[in-house]
Swiss-Prot record:
InterPro entries: 3-IsopropMal_deHydase_lsu (IPR004430), Acnase/IPM_dHydase_lsu_aba_1/3 (IPR015931), Acoase/IPM_deHydtase_lsu_aba (IPR001030), Aconitase_4Fe-4S_BS (IPR018136), Aconitase_4Fe-4S_dom (IPR036008), IPM_dehydratase_rel_enz (IPR050067), IPMI_cat (IPR033941). [4Fe-4S] cluster binds at C353, C414, C417. It comes from the Bacteria. Catalyzes the isomerization between 2-isopropylmalate and 3-isopropylmalate, via the formation of 2-isopropylmaleate. It comes from Cellvibrio japonicus (strain Ueda107). Its cofactor is [4Fe-4S] cluster. This is 3-isopropylmalate dehydratase large subunit. GO terms for biological process: L-leucine biosynthetic process. Heterodimer of LeuC and LeuD. Its EC number is 4.2.1.33. Keywords: 4Fe-4S, Amino-acid biosynthesis, Branched-chain amino acid biosynthesis, Iron, Iron-sulfur, Leucine biosynthesis, Lyase, Metal-binding. It catalyses: (2R,3S)-3-isopropylmalate = (2S)-2-isopropylmalate. One of its GO terms (molecular function) is 3-isopropylmalate dehydratase activity. The gene is leuC. Binds 1 [4Fe-4S] cluster per subunit.
Amino acid sequence: MVAKTLYDKLWDAHLVHESDDGSALIYIDRHIVHEVTSPQAFDGLRMAGRKPWRVDSILATPDHNVPTTQKERAHGVSGIQDPVSLIQVQTLDDNCDEFGITEFKINDSRQGIVHVVGPESGACLPGMTIVCGDSHTATNGALGALAHGIGTSEVEHVMATQCLVAKKMKNMLIKVDGTLGLGVTPKDVVLAIIAKIGTAGGTGYAMEFGGQVFRDMSMEGRLTVCNMAIEAGARAGMVAVDQTTIDYVKGRPYAPSGDVWEQAVANWRELVSDEGAHFDAVIEIDGASIRPQVSWGTSPEMVVSVEDKVPDPANEPDPVKRKDMIRALEYMGLQANQPITSIYVDRVFIGSCTNSRIEDIRAAAEVVKGKQKAANVKEAIVVPGSGVVKAQAEAEGLDKIFTAAGIEWREPGCSMCLAMNADKLGAGEHCASTSNRNFEGRQGYGGRTHLVSPAMAAAAAIAGHFVDVRSFN
């Protein structure tokens, strides 16, 4: 028997048909839907007189456009002030009602960011193929699933046929061994990976994360890492199933139970790469060498340790990269060789599909407990990834820790990750952000994003500038 990678196994299990040109038809188990990339797909179904092939495979929730203040959320959809956002959220409600699709609506206690809701509800499970009209669908690969984003036309195709036309990707293994140091988090690990291989390093690959660091990592940490596989250029990221995976899934609302659970677990335990399986590329990193990371530029690969200085373009031999660095420094308002710890922040955002789960909230609360937000920080907000996360955090009293420190506690949503709702940066403002992208204008026109872990963001909120969280307390 030929040894297979985890990706090979997931692909083969869902292969419906393969053509001579290499294109294939893949069966899709779970389809997650939000308000931004679904309206045209529903219109397409309606115009063709079709219905979703498997309504029970679809789960919807609004996230990108929803407001996160209690004032706006108190009145449900009608309370949304932005007219475009209101239309998008209302349209999702109407479409789901018409086609009989399960939706966690804006004031449902289960509503949240699609990539948080899927795993925590058990709607996304090991061994599944999972798609959504959102590139960060790769998050779900942490469960030992094949998960990736699709375009709006593909959203319609999957609804109509339960299948997707695709080409098989190559296999890449990111192996991180050793032990992470104190204060080094999964977010730091994935930022360090991107810094090493670049934002195009994983292009054309399905990326498996392996090694001791990932075996020791919590499920929520793995979700953070797989979330940013797309920033490393890969379309999909994944981690092999182990006891951590199974313990995480057990008892969740949509997870199997009884005899079906036992059968499922037996199948899931096979979702590992076989010994001797071929990877087209292998990247090895020493986990002990990773330090808390801070992005300084306008690409996720423009990242260094908090101990370092802003890189000098003069030291970059590649003329294209040098030009990009010069542009990034100009946009970010930084100087070459400036210590990272000298960068002051105007706003702090703790949230997004990367870092808004309960472990992230706890880590941030631990840093700010008993302290006060710095006077120069105009705003610091904590936005839980779902109503479930919010309720858990409040049960633990974490919300009160933040509010006592002068940090706002918000309602679930994508929030300041992207400038599609009321939470935005002003031009020239620096933000310590736990999100996944630091492109020009990503958080608002002229906004300057610095990607960090929840603990590092929390420390910046208190200090007013970037500090090494390892020595902060």
